[in-house]
Curated annotation (Swiss-Prot):
Protein name per UniProt: UPF0179 protein MJ1627
PANTHER family found in the cross-reference section: UPF0179 PROTEIN MJ1627
Name of one Pfam family that matches: UPF0179
Highest taxon listed in the record's lineage: Archaea
InterPro entries xrefs: UPF0179 (IPR005369)
Coiled coil segments of this chain: none
Family: Belongs to the UPF0179 family.
Length: 151
């Protein structure tokens, strides 16, 4: 997927350039809001976005204390865990989540990453040189990836 930017609204207290968030979708309080389309119309549920610019105007919002600001966002890069043998910079792969139910593991959130779905294509931008001690003995590497369009 390209790094094309989208315009949306986010709580003023969260509106900081470089900030990242996962869009969780519309809530009941948004149903009759005049800004509903701008807040929710451009984003995909479950995706992680990075704020690249913040506009100064503040708008009222019944959900966000302090109102909301207009922000420009792009899809954020993701840090995920993959099998070591597949961890090569520049490679494009289909996402295969690491099967793990050890919620207490320090790596759990990387093996079960939010923002990417099983089967989606991604490109490895960087292999992180970090020693991973998987409690189940899996040979894993932490990588930074960007989503790519399925063609």
């Amino acid at each position: 997927m390209s790094k094309e930017s989208k315009i949306t609204l986010i709580g003023s207290k969260l509106a900081k350039t470089g900030g990242e968030f996962i869009y969780l979708g519309e809530i009941e309080e948004c149903k009759n809001c005049k800004f509903k389309r701008l807040c929710h119309g451009n984003l995909e549920v479950g995706r992680k976005y990075k704020i690249v610019s913040v506009r100064s105007a503040n708008h009222p919002c019944i959900v966000h204390e302090g109102g909301v600001k207009v922000v420009e966002v792009v899809l954020a890069d993701l840090t995920i865990m993959i099998e070591s043998k597949k961890a090569l910079e520049g490679v494009v792969l289909n996402h295969e989540p690491i099967t793990c139910d050890n919620f207490d593991c320090e790596y759990y959130s990387f093996c079960n990453s939010e923002g990417i779905k099983e089967g989606e294509k991604y490109k490895i931008k960087q292999v992180l040189n970090e020693k991973i001690n998987c409690p189940f003995g899996n040979s894993l590497k932490k990588v930074i990836v960007e989503l790519v369009e399925n063609k």
